[in-house]
């Protein structure tokens, strides 16, 4: 759960955090007993706890398909991300990955921590994949093949132009959006979304991650991972790594804001995609990551900390998003709130200020035209200020009771 200091600063986070903790425990207890599926769901919770929680809410067959789809692509991504693997070894593996998923003896040792376990024990994923219905298998194979080919292309070339950047993000994330749309359609729960809208869903998430992970990627050992397009960063510095140096802070922030502005172009497509969804579980599955993305962009925008350390939404706000995202009006409300926060951070002297404001106003216009903004609680902005003293008192009472209980039950009795 969130730290005590964070909870005291944002007491309204306490209940959503508690609910999230209980939901996580419940999800862990729902892991199937069959060995291959037990491995897959256990691994899912290890590589992405919040994603694992949302997947669990899907219907049984779709849930299994999405779980395997996620793990297959996570394994493919682990190979691509491992900078210790030579190009000569890496390219054939990613190109043939769609074949490896049919081979229940295949594995390849790479990655670290839980990702290494996923790769070493990949036969569990392959066996579970083979249990899926044919329409699910065909969709997963097709996307894996196309993604592997795209990754191979960019292993051998750098991201130079914005078109390159969009193409790379299409291969590693836009195709995920296309694949999920195919799985939703195969389940009979949704109409097949257009490739354009599905692609934007993936690009919005991927570009957010690339922006947020600048420092981690540039400091990667033995070789930096560089995804920011030269067409953008070369306007501000001579080398991409120069952005992390303090003497370049002003230029670095301008470059960062340029990157965020580029990502915002996909927001309206994302709103359209989500507004077309019918199933509540699929809707939440899609909506929660998108809200997290625009929230993360709002935190990163105009923030030098992106070049100094980790920038991410606090756990309590994440818990609120997971707890309170139920309808499209919640999504419009969150996008409107975060676009307001972004708008408040725009410096009129920034070279991209006009373009940034234009894109934010377009998002706000779409949210307003939905006619639903008045129906939702604006928890994202309002809860940032002010302390609920009653809730703080309750938290201290609960902590006191817990302390008393632990003291009486765990400490040795005095004779």
UniProtKB/Swiss-Prot annotation:
Membrane topology, record value: Multi-pass membrane protein
GO molecular function: squalene synthase [NAD(P)H] activity
Pathway in which this enzyme or protein is active: Terpene metabolism; lanosterol biosynthesis; lanosterol from farnesyl diphosphate: step 1/3
GO biological process: farnesyl diphosphate metabolic process; isoprenoid biosynthetic process; response to jasmonic acid; response to molecule of fungal origin
Chief localisation class: endoplasmic reticulum
Cellular localization per UniProt: Endoplasmic reticulum membrane
Xref: Gene3D superfamilies: Farnesyl Diphosphate Synthase
Cofactor(s), names only, from the UniProt record: Mg(2+); Mn(2+)
Family to which this protein belongs: Belongs to the phytoene/squalene synthase family.
Known role: Component of the triterpene saponins (e.g. ginsenosides or panaxosides) and phytosterols biosynthetic pathways. Catalyzes the biosynthesis of squalene.
Protein name, as recorded: Squalene synthase 12
Lineage of producing organism: Eukaryota, Viridiplantae, Streptophyta, Embryophyta, Tracheophyta
